Amino acid sequence: MRHFFRTQLIPTEVLRIADEFLPEIGMERTGHTARSRAFAGDLGKLQLSVRKEGGHYTFVEISTDQMGESRLDRNAKKFFLALHKAGDPRHRIEAAY
């Protein structure tokens, strides 16, 4: 599956958070470049890339080798939540109904 997220964090900060977050869920870094990371573990394989996108945004893309809504995909969404919290620590995430 592919997941996308746009954040105000700079690319190096996104990669730093990924390097901290993903090993906590049992993923081991298997490759890296200046703008990407590759992880693998019991949950599957994950590719993460970041790029600057018009103005002050960073576009984050995650691809997994899993089908449907796997545990790895749910953790990718939790990673996006961690990015959101890092970008705006005052914002309180709650249900909107």
Predicted regions and their residues:
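Short, hydrophobic/aromatic-rich segments at coil-to-beta transitions
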Residues: 31-39
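Beta-strand/loop substructures that line and gate deep hydrophobic ligand-binding cavities in soluble
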Residues: 40-97
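Terminal, regulation- and interaction-focused segments at domain boundaries
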Residues: 1-30
